[in-house]
Amino acid sequence: MDKTIVFKCGGSVIRELSDTFYENVRSLQAAGFKLAIVHGGGPEITNMLQKLDVKTEFVDGQRKTTKPVLEVAEMVLSGTVNKYFVSELAKHDISSVGVSGKDGQMLVADFLDQDVYGYVGEIKEVHPEMAEALMEKQFIPVIAPLSMTEECQTLNVNADLAASAVAGAMKADKLMFVTDVEGILKNGELLDVVTEQEALTLIDEGIISGGMIPKVQSALSALSGDVDEVMIVNGKGSIFTGETFKGTRIVKEKEAVL
């Protein structure tokens, strides 16, 4: 087996991942899957900004990244959060290497809108060769969502979009958004499979709402590229039974589901 899975773990769930989740990751790697992880860190960035009394503001739900905010974000993402994740993987006998999107110029970006958002990037190019080399040697690259411009200016990037871009560049078989819910629920029931059009309808109907909307939108963005399938899974429980994955699968067309 030679399949690739990219996990995206949000900052709010990283410290709540279950032992079962890590055991599943180890089992997938042992079964021959090549794995990569992209993580966020929003809550911990907020906490550190408050501790250091660095002023911040949000524009359209997105943190405006001034230079002082960028320095804290890089410290937290590449330092605290990234190395915590690497340590937790090591505790579960999983070899990983913590990097950011700056390493190997993996994520090349331009300013999204410097006047409005500050040092926030929009990804223009992905160079996954360094991460793929690690995966070939059975290391899991744990990637913090930071990027650089062609002039080597550091920019913060949205972790969901970073994961989608990395998965597309790697032509991953699956992109998994690891959350604290089982997947997409409708009337309290887990939806096993949702097509692109069904997902858009569920958003319009308000069934997909709140923080799930950007994840589903990122999933749809990934599907428009080279990713075959996106899943929303629960990192607080089991995501893999040994034969099947647990969660909601988002696919282009149901006819394509095997």
From Swiss-Prot:
EC class of the enzyme, as a word: transferase
Keyword Cytoplasm appears in the UniProt entry: yes
GO biological process, any: arginine biosynthetic process via ornithine
Compartment(s): Cytoplasm
Annotated Gene Ontology cellular component terms: cytoplasm
EC number from the UniProt entry: 2.7.2.8
Pfam families referenced in this protein's UniProt entry, alphabetically: AA_kinase
Keywords, ordered alphabetically: Amino-acid biosynthesis, Arginine biosynthesis, ATP-binding, Cytoplasm, Kinase, Nucleotide-binding, Transferase
UniProt signal peptide: none
CDD domains cross-referenced by the UniProt entry: AAK_NAGK-like
Binding residue positions for substrate: G41, G42, R63, N156
Residues the record marks as site: Transition state stabilizer: K8, K215
A Gene Ontology molecular function term of the record: acetylglutamate kinase activity
Pathway: Amino-acid biosynthesis; L-arginine biosynthesis; N(2)-acetyl-L-ornithine from L-glutamate: step 2/4
InterPro entries per UniProt: AceGlu_kinase-like_sf, AcgluKinase_fam, ArgB, Asp/Glu/Uridylate_kinase
Main location: cytoplasm
Reactions listed under catalytic activity: N-acetyl-L-glutamate + ATP = N-acetyl-L-glutamyl 5-phosphate + ADP
Cross-referenced PANTHER family: N-ACETYLGLUTAMATE SYNTHASE (PTHR23342), N-ACETYLGLUTAMATE SYNTHASE, MITOCHONDRIAL (PTHR23342:SF0)
HAMAP family: ArgB
NCBIfam families given in the database record: argB (TIGR00761)
Family: Belongs to the acetylglutamate kinase family. ArgB subfamily.
Protein's UniProt name: Acetylglutamate kinase
Species this chain originates from: Bacillus pumilus (strain SAFR-032)
Source organism phylogeny: Bacteria, Bacillati, Bacillota, Bacilli, Bacillales
This protein's encoding gene: argB
